[in-house]
C-alpha cells in the first residue's frame, strides 16, 4: 500500500511540471516563450521527437525544414532523410531559416542559445524540452494543435497514456525491485539522474536508480559507490555503444551483480532520450 501511495504521489508531482503546454489559448514553454495556440503551415523543427510525432499524426506536411542529427536517425528514416535541412539539431544556420520563411520554429533545449537570435529575425519560436514522460504526453497534444492534427494527436496521447498506465499496474504487482543505472559516459562514469527522461523511465518501470542518491544532473558514480550499491544491471546510452566500454571502465564492474550475471547492455538513445511517442513502445519492451 505504501508503495502505491508513493507511486501516485510521484505521478501527481510529475503533472505539476511542464515543458510546453496549452494555456488560455496560448502555447507556453518553460522558458517563457509564448505563441498563439493555432495551426501553423510552415514549421521548422530541430527537435527529433517532435518530428517523429508529426509524422505519426500525419502532420508532416507542415514541416518546411528540420535540424538533422549527426549520429542516430529520425523515424521514419527514409521519409525524414528527404526533408530540407537548416543545419544540425545543435547548430542551426540562421540564413537558412530566413530562406524557408517559417511561421513557427520549434527547437529543443540544445538550441537555447539560438532562441533570441531567431526572435530578432521576427519569427515565432517555442522550446519543446520534455524531461519526463508526462511532459511528452502534453507535447503530443501541443504538436497536434500547431500542425492542425488535434484529433489524431489526442488519439496518440490516449494510446500512449494507456501503455504507461498498463506498465505502472504491472510493475506494482511485481515483488522484486531491481536496482540499476543508465550511464551517460564511462570516463568519468556518469549516470542519468531521477530528473532526466531516462531517470523517469526507470521510475515508471519500478527500478531503483542508484544515481538518485548522488547529487548533480549527471551524477558521477565512483567505483566504491558502484560496488556498495551492487546494481542488478548497468545500461549505456549517448556515446556508449558497447557493453565492453562499461565493463572495462572499472575493475569493480565485474564484481557487481550486473557484471556477474552479464546484465550490461546498450540502449537505443534515439528511443530513450527523445521527446517522442516511441519511448512508450520501448518501455513495453523493457518491462
Model segments located where?
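Bacterial Sec-exported substrate-binding components of ABC uptake systems
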Residues: 15-51, 150-181
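Short helix-initiation/N-cap motifs at beta->coil->alpha
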Residues: 30, 84-95, 214-223
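Extracytoplasmic ligand-binding site segments that recognize negatively charged/polar headgroups
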Residues: 129-142, 181-197
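Sec-dependent N-terminal signal peptides
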Residues: 4-13
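Alpha-helical, coiled-coil/dimerization segments enriched in small aliphatic residues
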Residues: 70-72, 190-218
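A short, structured surface patch at a secondary-structure boundary
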Residues: 45-100, 104-110, 210
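Structured C-terminal subdomain patch of bacterial secreted/periplasmic proteins
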Residues: 137-145, 152-159, 165-171, 233, ...
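Proline-aspartate-enriched helix->loop->beta-strand connector
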Residues: 93-107, 123, 222-236
Amino acid at each position: 500500500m505504501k508503495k502505491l501511495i508513493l507511486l501516485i504521489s510521484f505521478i501527481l508531482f510529475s503533472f505539476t511540471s511542464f515543458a510546453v503546454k496549452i494555456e488560455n489559448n496560448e502555447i507556453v514553454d518553460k522558458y517563457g516563450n509564448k505563441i498563439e495556440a493555432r495551426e501553423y503551415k510552415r514549421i521548422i523543427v530541430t527537435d527529433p521527437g517532435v518530428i517523429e510525432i508529426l509524422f505519426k499524426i500525419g502532420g508532416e506536411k507542415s514541416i518546411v525544414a528540420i535540424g538533422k542529427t549527426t549520429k542516430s536517425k529520425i523515424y521514419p528514416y527514409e521519409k525524414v532523410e528527404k526533408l530540407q535541412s537548416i543545419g544540425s539539431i545543435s547548430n542551426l544556420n540562421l540564413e537558412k531559416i530566413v530562406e524557408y520563411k517559417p511561421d513557427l520554429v520549434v527547437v529543443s533545449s540544445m538550441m537555447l542559445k539560438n532562441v533570441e537570435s531567431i526572435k530578432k529575425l521576427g519569427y515565432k519560436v517555442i522550446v519543446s524540452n520534455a524531461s519526463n514522460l508526462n511532459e511528452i504526453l502534453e507535447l503530443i497534444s501541443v504538436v497536434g494543435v500547431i500542425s492542425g492534427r488535434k484529433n489524431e494527436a489526442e488519439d496518440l496521447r490516449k494510446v500512449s497514456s494507456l501503455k504507461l498506465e498498463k506498465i505502472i499496474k504491472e510493475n506494482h504487482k511485481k515483488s522484486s525491485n531491481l536496482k540499476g543505472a543508465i550511464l551517460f559516459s564511462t570516463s568519468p562514469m556518469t549516470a542519468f539522474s531521477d530528473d532526466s527522461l531516462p531517470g523517469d523511465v526507470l521510475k515508471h518501470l519500478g527500478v531503483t536508480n542508484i544515481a538518485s542518491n548522488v547529487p548533480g544532473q549527471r551524477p558521477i558514480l565512483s567505483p566504491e559507490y558502484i560496488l556498495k550499491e551492487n546494481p542488478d544491471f548497468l545500461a549505456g546510452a549517448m556515446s556508449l555503444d558497447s557493453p565492453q566500454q562499461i565493463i572495462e571502465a572499472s575493475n569493480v564492474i565485474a564484481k557487481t551483480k550486473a557484471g556477474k550475471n552479464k546484465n550490461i547492455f546498450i540502449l537505443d538513445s534515439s528511443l530513450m532520450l527523445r521527446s517522442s511517442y516511441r519511448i512508450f513502445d520501448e518501455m513495453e519492451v523493457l518491462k
